[in-house]
UniProtKB/Swiss-Prot annotation:
This is Gastrin-releasing peptide receptor. Belongs to the G-protein coupled receptor 1 family. One of its GO terms (biological process) is motor behavior. Receptor for gastrin-releasing peptide (GRP). Signals via association with G proteins that activate a phosphatidylinositol-calcium second messenger system, resulting in Akt phosphorylation. Contributes to the regulation of food intake. Contributes to the perception of prurient stimuli and transmission of itch signals in the spinal cord that promote scratching behavior, but does not play a role in the perception of pain. Contributes primarily to nonhistaminergic itch sensation. Expressed in the hippocampal CA1 region (at protein level). The modification Phosphoserine is found at residue 351.
């Protein structure tokens, strides 16, 4: 793809799909700075391909573990498997489309693709951030308000909540599908007309400002603010619990407190990864939306934009590996899946892991949860 094609717009006309244009040229397009090297258009899709492959391996393995290992089917893990499903959907649909813009000078996926791809990606982003919010709420209830937990039909209720998250995410993405279209754009300075998949016409500078700000608030600021409030109360409760615990307290109680801390930290790591990976993409889109009439063809802007896009998609492949590092039981199951074709190693893994299964705080024999008495309250413990 000729980088000059995108130089006419100072923003990715779709915050999740960079501009893919079909030109009707009457004059030579304005050239970007001399820094651009043609090899970049092959390196970037290769990086996309690496992200897709790694993400597929991690998320498919994670979903397979939660579907086939009965002891892993609990409240937090059900949310995490829903999160993995959303990431998987993003990687197999939107990531290849995003990579294709560097290899083609035109939009390859027609009008239907122009409406469907933004819808899928916004749905996936919604599933990710709203599931993280639900996970934070679950940790808040388990740690701060354990008396509110009801053991009966816990998994069924969580399944309904996960389904509701998908429905809400799809409803919020409907405007993206309705208004996204192959819009003709005309550049007065060069007398060029091109077709681009965009969520709004090019005629009004207010459209990108509204679109970028709404996306930033609904899919980033508001959910992360809610999560921050939850974690403030979680941290405060854990600190108070540590102070109130007797010096020679019950060993089981101490283990339960440590389990709660690990679970809260796991969810917090997921939240931190999402915030870190998606913030640059939102910031760049806001910058472009509020500098709509200007054109930035600098190397810094180009590299920053590419890195922001790659970082956003990287978020869809890192969660399984973060869970691998944080959870002993998931690490064991992940190794079991990878070593399934090596019986001797698999048997050795089972024999060494069986003695520690009952001690790890990330695995439960109860499909929904376990309950214990801590500081006079019934405490709900989920596992990852």
């Amino acid at each position: 793809m000729d980088p000059n094609n995108c130089s006419h717009l100072n923003l990715e006309v779709d915050p999740f799909l960079s501009c893919n244009n079909t030109f009707n040229q009457t004059l030579n397009p304005p050239k970007m700075d001399n820094w651009f090297h043609p090899g970049i258009i092959y390196v970037i899709p290769a990086v996309y391909g690496l992200i897709i492959v790694i993400g597929l391996i991690g998320n498919i393995t994670l979903i397979k573990i939660f579907c086939t290992v009965k002891s892993m089917r609990n409240v937090p893990n059900l949310f995490i498997s829903s999160l993995a499903l959303g990431d998987l959907l993003l990687l197999v649909t939107c990531a290849p489309v995003d990579a294709s813009k560097y290899l083609a000078d035109r939009w390859l996926f027609g009008r239907i693709g122009c409406k469907l791809i933004p819808f899928i990606q916004l749905t996936s982003v919604g599933v990710s951030v709203f599931t993280l919010t639900a996970l934070s709420a679950d940790r808040y209830k388990a740690i701060v308000r354990p008396m509110d937990i009801q053991a009966s039909h816990a998994l069924m209720k969580i399944c309904l909540k996960a389904a509701l998250i998908w429905i809400v995410s799809m409803l919020l993405a409907i405007p993206e599908a309705v208004f996204s279209d192959l819009h003709p754009f005309h550049v007065k300075d060069t007398n060029q007309t091109f077709i681009s998949c965009a969520p709004y016409p090019h005629s009004n500078e207010l459209h990108p400002k509204i679109h970028s700000m709404a996306s930033f608030l609904v899919f980033y600021i508001i959910p992360l603010s809610i999560i921050s409030v939850y974690y403030y109360f979680i941290a405060r409760n854990l600190i108070q619990s540590a102070y109130n615990l007797p010096v020679e307290g019950n060993i089981h109680v101490k283990k339960q407190i440590e389990s709660r801390k690990r679970l809260a930290k796991t969810v917090l790591v997921f939240v931190g990864l999402f915030a870190f990976c998606w913030l640059p993409n939102h910031v760049i889109y806001l910058y472009r939306s509020y500098h709509y009439s200007e054109v930035d063809t600098s190397m810094l802007h180009f590299i920053t934009s590419i890195c922001a896009r790659l970082l956003a998609f990287t978020n869809s492949c890192v969660n399984p590996f973060a869970l691998y590092l944080l959870s002993k039981s998931f690490r064991k199951q992940f190794n079991t899946q990878l070593l399934c074709c090596q019986p001797s190693l698999l048997n050795r893994s089972h024999s060494t892991g069986r003695s520690t299964t009952c001690m790890t705080s990330f695995k439960s024999t109860n499909p929904s949860a376990t309950f214990s008495l801590i500081n006079g309250n019934i405490c709900h413990e989920g596992y990852v």
